Regions:
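Short, charged/polar N-terminal "headpieces" of proteins
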Residues: 1-23
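Generic structural motif recognizing short loop/turn segments at the entrances and edges of beta-strands
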Residues: 2, 17-19, 28-30, 74-78
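Acidic, low-complexity intrinsically disordered segments
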Residues: 3-6, 46-85
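Generic alpha-helical secondary structure signal
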Residues: 10, 16, 36-37, 59, ...
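Aromatic side chains
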Residues: 12, 32-33, 55
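A short, structured beta-strand/loop element
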Residues: 18-43
Length: 85
């Protein structure tokens, strides 16, 4: 069984326009990102909404997709976009 631990979000990365999702996966540090576009389009956030807050409000769904992708072998640096939800 895969050992996956989520630790919340790691803040907003303005250069990537995404919220960092730090993950411990089988002892390795993995970084996924959730795009601002996904937060706006798929989770109904207002354009001026705090990306971290929108992430927190939808954390369960985000973690479910991240878990699926980890099991499929998608590694460090994966960006979750609106199409992933």
């Amino acid at each position: 069984m895969l050992d996956i631990e989520f630790s919340g979000h790691g803040g907003y990365d303005a250069a990537r326009e995404a919220v960092l999702l730090p993950i411990q996966f089988d002892g390795a540090d993995i970084r996924y990102y959730v795009s601002r576009d996904a937060l706006l389009r798929k989770f109904g956030a207002a354009a001026d909404a705090d990306p971290g807050k929108v992430f927190d409000e939808n954390r369960l769904q985000i973690e479910m997709i991240a878990t699926l992708y980890l099991r499929q072998g998608k590694g460090d640096g994966t960006v979750l976009t609106a199409d992933d939800f």
